[in-house]
Amino acid sequence: MASVSEHCLNEIKPTILKCDKNKDRQYSIDEIVQLLKKNSKNPERLAVLLFKSLNKKLDESICFNDIDDREISKNCDKFQDKPEIDIESFLLRFDKNNDKMISHHELKTKLDELGCGNSKKTTDYVFEQIDTNKEGSLSYEDLEGFVKFLKQDNNKKTSLPSV
């Protein structure tokens, strides 16, 4: 039986290879997200998993010249349950100007797109709870701190209030 990561790789590899317009076999994480948006439920999360498993040089792009499916599968499994994957995919989904921060406007706009009826109240609440330094934007560190807080208090039921 195939692992989750093998299934993910089998799902996305043909699409990515087929969409290489200039045939240089180099992709940024944003390009991968765009490619996956058509056929994936959570393209940001899949892109982060793929990027982390392939980007050995830790630069701004990944290369498909030396793909080793078994190594990718092993690496994806290693990252699969790490909270930073979800944090990074959350940032990719909501950070429209690619500054690695989520502004009040970016969050509200995305919530409006998703059909949230009370996006202003929800956005205000999220920022009140997570923006600890009150900069007016959510950073990776803010989100990471919130995830750690939730993990510490995992016996309590924590959820956003209905607004």
Curated annotation (Swiss-Prot):
Residues of the signal peptide: none
Binding site residues for Ca(2+) 2: D131, N133, E135, S137, D142
Disulphide bond pairs: none
Keywords: Calcium, Metal-binding, Repeat
Residues the record lists as binding Ca(2+) 1: D95, N97, D99, M101, E106
Span of domain EF-hand: 20-42, 82-117, 118-153
Molecular-function GO term, any one: calcium ion binding
InterPro entries hit by this protein: EF-hand-dom_pair (IPR011992), EF_Hand_1_Ca_BS (IPR018247), EF_hand_dom (IPR002048)
SUPFAM superfamilies reported for this sequence: EF-hand (SSF47473)
Miscellaneous field: Does not bind calcium in vitro.
Protein name: Calcium-binding protein I
Gene: cbpI
